[in-house]
Swiss-Prot record:
Myoactive. The keyword Secreted applies. One of its GO terms (molecular function) is neuropeptide hormone activity. GO terms for cellular component: extracellular region. Expressed in the brain, subesophageal ganglion and in the retrocerebral complex (mainly corpora cardiaca). The lineage of its organism: Eukaryota, Metazoa, Ecdysozoa, Arthropoda, Hexapoda. The modification Leucine amide is found at L14. Disulfide bonds: none annotated. This is Pyrokinin-6. It comes from Periplaneta australasiae. Keywords: Amidation, Neuropeptide, Secreted. It is found in: Secreted.
Amino acid sequence: NDPEVPGMWFGPRL
């Protein structure tokens, strides 16, 4: 859920 990292939106910071 990182707006600055669109590729990690559904990654470890879900």
